[in-house]
Amino acid sequence: MGDWRTISLPESDKILQYSSEIRMSPTSLLSSPSHSAANTLSGIVYNFCTEDNIEQCITYIDQELRTIGFPTVQAVSKNGDGRKLHLVSIVNCIHELLQRNSQNMRSKEEVETQLLKINGDLEHLQSIYQRQKDQMEATRRENCALQERDRQMQCKNRNLLQLLKNEKEEVQKLQNIIASRSTQFNHSVKRKEREYNKLKERLYQLVMDKRDKKISIDVLNYVGRADGKRTSWRTGKTDAKNEEEMYKVLLNDYEQRQKQLMVENAELKKVLQQMKKEMISILSQRKTKEKLDDSIGPVASDIEEDLADSSKENLSELSCEAVREQLVSSIRQQWRILKSHMEKLDNQATPDENGMIARGDHEQELGKLINEIQQCKETIKIQQQLLKQQFSVPRDDTSTLLQDCYLLEDKERLQEEWKLFNEQKKNFEKERRNFTEAAIRLGHEKKAFEEDRAAWLKHQFLNMTVFTDHKNSEEKRAHGVHFSPEQDHCRLHSRTHDRHLASSGDHYQRPRKTLPITPSSKHSLTQRESVAWRDSSISPNGTDF
């Protein structure tokens, strides 16, 4: 009996043999078992059976075949001397073994073919999995972009709703102002109608009183007409006709006079309202333009309503001279308030010695810069966290190559972002320097503008001719000098024109500093133009301010 011997192979040899067998084609598999079997059989023949132990080998093979289920290969000899080999049994056993070997080889080939199919399916599934993973990543990025776009659209929608709400409020305010103005206009029309009726009745009374108290001298020797025609006889009909014509002429004259007075009154009211609005805008301490526009409307409407109420109460009882005096006194009061306020501004018009930018603007700009730096820091922290998460995730054998590719792409993209960040940082530093220079230049411009404004206001208030013109008008009125509406209107326009020329000449003669045009300088120019237009405004009594 021979001993069983087991051959132990290293794990690397097994793996190489397994991998080589997997990658072999079925045709090579069909040919390879025969060669390997031949090699192994030749080794077993030379190692297992020799001439010395042939009997023992035959006995061992017979026992093994019987244990497997084959018939014995030895038969008893007829002589009874011993056992001999039975060739038929040996051939049958060999044939059966060959059949089983061929079946095992076919089953092995089938298993190997199935293994190849399974490996191919596995690779296909891995490729599908990787493609689905890439699609999922792209879908996730697209979803994030859509969410960001949705958020921006919602913010824009909220801003538009807020603007719509503000516009509706403005429309409501304007509608209320229009309604109040319409009611004031209706009241003024009714008041004018009542005044017209009263003046008509008073005119009729004056004419009738003069007719009753008329003292005349009859002409005995009447001089003939220049054309040589005879004069008509004076009868009751001719007298009535002449009186009617006289009344018609008087009524036409009074109507024309009333129309002219109404036109002049409307113009003077417009000038007065404009002056009051400008006074209120100057006297108000609001800083921003929106607040100023919102505050001028209600305050001016209140003042106009007060003035309209006072004029409604006193206009029917006072004459034109009294109304003019009342308007002049109100304008004087407003100008006194304006003068005191301008003197205060003149005292406060001295700017800082350094002429630097205001502290509030500087702090606001610093706050913006700090917010931008904080956002950059947060972005860098988020990127670092993402990089740590990517490095901390355990790598599988299948995803190592893909992770390396992703890391290379992320590294390149990060380098590009760093380059862009450095460029933005340089641009930001450049803009910061430009802003500092512009702030310094703006401080100098503001200082120069305040000096010019203080000097100009001082010159204007020192050369005011409101009270002197008013005294001259009172002296002329005391001496009985009266002007017709046409003469008053011409005098008004001539003084307006002269005053406008004088003020424009003063502006042109005064030296100015040439500075670069900035938003603040544009605002200062608009303020100067508005002040010059206010100087060319005219008071109701014919004097200019």
Swiss-Prot record:
Q: Which Pfam families match?
A: ADIP
Protein's name in the database? Afadin- and alpha-actinin-binding protein B
Please give the chief subcellular localization of this protein: other
Q: Where is this region: Disordered?
A: 497-545
Matching entries from InterPro entries are given as: Adhesion_Centrosome_assoc, Afadin/alpha-actinin-bd
Q: Write out the coiled-coil annotation as residue ranges.
A: 106-287, 358-442
**Its job:** Belongs to an adhesion system, which plays a role in the organization of homotypic, interneuronal and heterotypic cell-cell adherens junctions (AJs). Involved in cell movement. Acts as a centrosome maturation factor, probably by maintaining the integrity of the pericentriolar material and proper microtubule nucleation at mitotic spindle poles. The function seems to implicate at least in part WRAP73; the SSX2IP:WRAP73 complex is proposed to act as regulator of spindle anchoring at the mitotic centrosome.
Instruction: Locate the compositionally biased regions of type Polar residues.
Output: 517-529, 536-545
Family under the similarity heading: Belongs to the ADIP family.
Localisation per UniProt entry:
Cell junction, Adherens junction; Cytoplasm, Cytoskeleton, Microtubule organizing center, Centrosome, Centriolar satellite
Keyword set, alphabetical order: Cell adhesion, Cell junction, Coiled coil, Cytoplasm, Cytoskeleton, Microtubule
A cellular component term from Gene Ontology for this protein is: centriolar satellite
Q: What phylogenetic lineage does the species belong to? A: Eukaryota, Metazoa, Chordata, Craniata, Vertebrata
How is this protein organized at the quaternary level? Answer: Interacts with WRAP73.
Which domain of life does this protein belong to?
Eukaryota
Example GO biological process: centrosome cycle
**GO MF annotation list:** microtubule minus-end binding
Q: Does the keyword Calcium apply?
A: no
Please indicate if the UniProt record lists Coiled coil as a keyword.
yes
Q: Which organism is it from?
A: Xenopus laevis
